């Protein structure tokens, strides 16, 4: 096929014949471009709106909610598998207290207790919270779990929940007889007679038992006095009835209510409705869950790390001596 010859329109100038397709593309808008831009703009606007709702509105107190913080598991000084770390829990309390959109705080408790120090740390932190705060005991809020509850302004409990157990305990493990049977021996070099108190490799002697008993009673007295301080204002509280349960017995929620250790019996929803009305949000308040923001891997590694740390601590320092409230 012959190739069209290019025409010269002047000296040194060559004109190319314009193709119909090129002219058509110039005259007709490209389909899909404007629509794509609109979708992109909508996505950007949506992201900005979500950012505004999640970050800016709470910071200026628009709307309102009650902050729900779960205390679920054994109370310890640091987080681990099945435990609640007091340090992180206190941070959650402070975060809720500093948010203008959180009008009140409810601690939802399901804990058998735990570390004396950790329980008291959370109790002390609750006393510094400025907002209205209540506790709800669901399945269990015993011992250290109840210690935490008395730091709030009002205690709800399910009638069938387990609470009470006001006391302290030190646990010692003795495997010396097993070692004798298996022919295993252990030698301890120590600077003082009681440096290895709590060791599992021999029975505790009389002086060690007396010392530990004094510490346990000191912790118990502090626990008891704290309960009297925080609960004596309840109209049902009776010191005579209270003395009867100081053998560290567990109580049902209903039994605790009858002697003034709990303010009201009810469900989780009723506790939230009570707090909602108390802070002016009505019986169906919006819920803001205050919780640690961690991924699965970080939580797993933290649990493993604390487990190793606890094992080393027990083996090198306090061995198997554990004080629980």
Regions found by a protein language model. Name each.
Residues 145:
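Pocket-flanking alpha-helical
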Residues 148-149, 256:
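Hydrophobic/aromatic residues within transmembrane alpha-helices
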Residues 152-170:
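Zinc-dependent metallopeptidase catalytic helix centered on the HExxH motif
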Residues 1-135, 140-141, 154-157, 172-325:
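N-terminal organellar transit peptides
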């Amino acid at each position: 096929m012959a190739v069209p010859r290019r025409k010269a329109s002047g000296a040194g100038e060559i004109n190319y014949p314009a193709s119909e397709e090129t002219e058509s593309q110039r005259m007709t808008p490209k389909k899909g471009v404007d629509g794509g831009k609109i979708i992109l703009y909508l996505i950007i606007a949506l992201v900005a709106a979500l950012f505004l709702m999640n970050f800016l509105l709470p910071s200026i107190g628009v709307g309102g909610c009650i902050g729900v913080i779960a205390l679920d598991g054994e109370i310890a000084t640091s987080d681990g598998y099945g435990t609640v770390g007091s340090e992180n829990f206190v941070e959650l309390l402070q975060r809720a207290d500093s948010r203008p959109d959180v009008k009140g705080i409810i601690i939802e408790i399901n804990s058998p207790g735990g570390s004396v120090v950790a329980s008291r740390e959370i109790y002390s932190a609750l006393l510094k919270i400025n907002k209205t705060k209540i506790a709800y005991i669901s399945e269990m809020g015993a011992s250290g779990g109840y210690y935490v509850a008395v730091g709030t302004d009002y205690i709800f409990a399910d009638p069938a929940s387990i609470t009470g157990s006001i006391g302290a305990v030190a646990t010692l493990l003795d495997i010396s007889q097993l070692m004798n049977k298996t022919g295993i021996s252990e030698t301890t070099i120590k600077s003082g007679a009681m440096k290895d108190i709590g060791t599992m490799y021999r029975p505790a002697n009389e002086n060690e038992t007396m010392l530990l008993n004094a510490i346990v009673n000191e912790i118990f007295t502090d626990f008891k006095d704290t309960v009297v301080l925080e609960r004596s204002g309840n109209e049902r509280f009776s010191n005579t009835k209270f003395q009867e349960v100081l053998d560290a017995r567990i109580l049902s929620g209903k039994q605790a209510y009858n002697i003034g250790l709990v303010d009201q019996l009810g469900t989780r929803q009723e506790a939230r409705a009570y707090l909602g009305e108390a802070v002016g949000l009505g019986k169906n308040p919006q819920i803001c869950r205050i919780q640690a923001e961690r991924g699965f891997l970080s939580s797993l590694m933290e649990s493993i790390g604390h487990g190793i740390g606890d094992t080393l601590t027990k083996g090198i320092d306090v061995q198997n001596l554990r004080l629980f409230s």
